[in-house]
């Protein structure tokens, strides 16, 4: 008799994975969570009395080919942080507080301990972002993915008062652009990274002097979460626009927050470019503009504020929360982005 397990799908392994992840999932729960693990849908009680006109904000993203680094390192407990960060950093650009998160893990073979490590990272990211992990799917897909590989994606939902949505509409010429430091490459550009470095397990274990760590540790660094910083900052200062520097780097993402007819001049040298980007540029013989069109270059998020408060915002951020820099200015003479 042929069984589902004979076809490569181990239902019992799925049950074991759920058992192992249970405590991590439950530590993300907020009081609004109305379900336990294992339901068909995650229930979340929206406290709409806190808002006059509540607006839900959603976002979805994945970790991309950074996962190939995790496979080589056999390290799976931080890529979940990347997954959460990619989603919640997007929705906080609208000023939204993340409420809950769902994950999707597709893999060639369900190894419960590995799945539990992935979910631990997701839970760590959710705790840092203040959102609840209320659902997920682990899909074992033999013959579709290699046994030791998986893909990881997530979905976040947040809320913002309609009158407090940050949409860039108030940005004007003369406003300053503030950059918040990244932790490293984050989760974009890894196809180019892998082409340049051709990483192997042996290469990833090598100590790189200019990085101050091994290549593997540098490449696997989790994406920085900016949620608590932005939610705190917007209660104290008027933030006119926010751009999450992801795929497309500076050149694609910063103009997305600008009203039509405006552009940005970014001042080269106004923040420290991280050594990993210098290494990639040198080894790959990359054009500088290609770098700015692919990587975050050491700045993971940018915010636009009135020029009169820019120094105060930077000073506030640098007290103990972030490394922040005034990196440019909004202009009216040219649309798009210029590095000068």
From Swiss-Prot:
It is an enzyme of class 6 (ligase). Pathway: Purine metabolism; IMP biosynthesis via de novo pathway; 5-amino-1-(5-phospho-D-ribosyl)imidazole from N(2)-formyl-N(1)-(5-phospho-D-ribosyl)glycinamide: step 2/2. The keyword Phosphoprotein does not apply. Its EC number is 6.3.3.1. Keywords: ATP-binding, Cytoplasm, Ligase, Nucleotide-binding, Purine biosynthesis. One of its GO terms (cellular component) is cytosol. The keyword Membrane does not apply. InterPro entries: PurM-like_C_dom, PurM-like_C_sf, PurM-like_N, PurM-like_N_sf, PurM_cligase. One of its GO terms (biological process) is adenine biosynthetic process. It comes from the Bacteria. It catalyses: 2-formamido-N(1)-(5-O-phospho-beta-D-ribosyl)acetamidine + ATP = 5-amino-1-(5-phospho-beta-D-ribosyl)imidazole + ADP + phosphate + H(+). PANTHER family: TRIFUNCTIONAL PURINE BIOSYNTHETIC PROTEIN ADENOSINE-3, TRIFUNCTIONAL PURINE BIOSYNTHETIC PROTEIN ADENOSINE-3-RELATED. Belongs to the AIR synthase family. This is Phosphoribosylformylglycinamidine cyclo-ligase. It comes from Acetivibrio thermocellus (strain ATCC 27405 / DSM 1237 / JCM 9322 / NBRC 103400 / NCIMB 10682 / NRRL B-4536 / VPI 7372) (Clostridium thermocellum). The gene is purM.
